[in-house]
Amino acid sequence: MSNKPLRIGIVAGELSGDTLGEGFIKAIKAVHPDAEFVGIGGPKMIALGCQSLFDMEELAVMGLVEVLGRLPRLLKVKAELVRYFTENPPDVFVGIDAPDFNLRLELDLKNAGIKTVHYVSPSVWAWRQKRIFKIAKATHLVLAFLPFEKAFYDKFNVPCEFIGHTLADAIPLESDKAPARELLGLEQDKQWLAVLPGSRGSELKMLSQPFIETCKKLQQAFPELGFVVALVNQKRREQFEQAWKEYAPELDFKLVDDTARNVITASDAVMLASGTVALECMLLKRPMVVGYRVNAVTAFLAKRLLKTQYVSLPNILADTELVKEYLQDDCTPDNLFGEVSRLLEGDNHQMLDKFTEMHHWIRKDADQQAANAVLKLIEK
């Protein structure tokens, strides 16, 4: 490599990507303090000197309708970035997550002779598996959080590096209930069930009723049990309060506008919607049950498109049903009540020991591994 400072093109599309970008930039700068980063970043990346050509908010659009409305602007941003990077070629381009935007950008840059990396594998192993060919065309390397993702890429001879999961690095191997309870103002000497009905409006719409009715049954069976609910923002809080009023106004829920992490840490067992939060719960070593419902159309499509036997990451990782999953018509108060009761009364050692083992599998200092893999690619 020449004496010129390293130049890395980088695009993060949302807050989670900004956090990954921050860790990656720190790890690169530890080896190359004068490295330059340019593209699109959030506040954390910008604080480390990343030059952001556009506001990250431009890319953080969810849902088909919103995306269609923003399409002309998104295409303009992409065209500007292609022009900028072809005129000022970086040593490598790293697209963090945001696959709909980044893979298209990576394809154009790869065709222009720039080395490209996609950081965070899309869920190709789970559905729309043909996307892997598009990913192969667009990238020189994929950085994957989970070992089964790398195994999938290997099957198709697509270069992929398993770097471990940043959450597994961030969460200690053991987590103590008492400080979390103190922080949330929960009584220390009673049992608590964490209730996590999801972060999206559509999830709360589907799950508030079965989750609240499950708590109603639990209250009768375990009069001393406390219920603590994690809600990501004011909108979700209002939505849950509405359902609470409707289905069980007599129940005493403790609502918390805090991260799921503190609420899970404070609890004895967890009832949750599927998603990254199931992985977090596994890493915090709390027994859990997964309940999930989607609308009929999505369910119909998922049945045909999903290629995995399970929906929650702990089960996919273990390749067995460690955690009970109640989906669609099985997501009933009776089923959830039965499993939560078992978790509260039973011995969960086997489940929790496996959680610890899996934590070790994916705890590899992902920031450092990502930096190493990218530096190796630059030197090729």
Curated annotation (Swiss-Prot):
InterPro entries: Glyco_trans_19. Pathway: Bacterial outer membrane biogenesis; LPS lipid A biosynthesis. GO terms for molecular function: lipid-A-disaccharide synthase activity; phospholipid binding. Keywords: Glycosyltransferase, Lipid A biosynthesis, Lipid biosynthesis, Lipid metabolism, Transferase. GO terms for biological process: lipid A biosynthetic process. The keyword RNA-binding does not apply. GO terms for cellular component: membrane. It catalyses: a lipid X + a UDP-2-N,3-O-bis[(3R)-3-hydroxyacyl]-alpha-D-glucosamine = a lipid A disaccharide + UDP + H(+). Its EC number is 2.4.1.182. Condensation of UDP-2,3-diacylglucosamine and 2,3-diacylglucosamine-1-phosphate to form lipid A disaccharide, a precursor of lipid A, a phosphorylated glycolipid that anchors the lipopolysaccharide to the outer membrane of the cell. Belongs to the LpxB family. This is Lipid-A-disaccharide synthase. It comes from Vibrio vulnificus (strain YJ016).
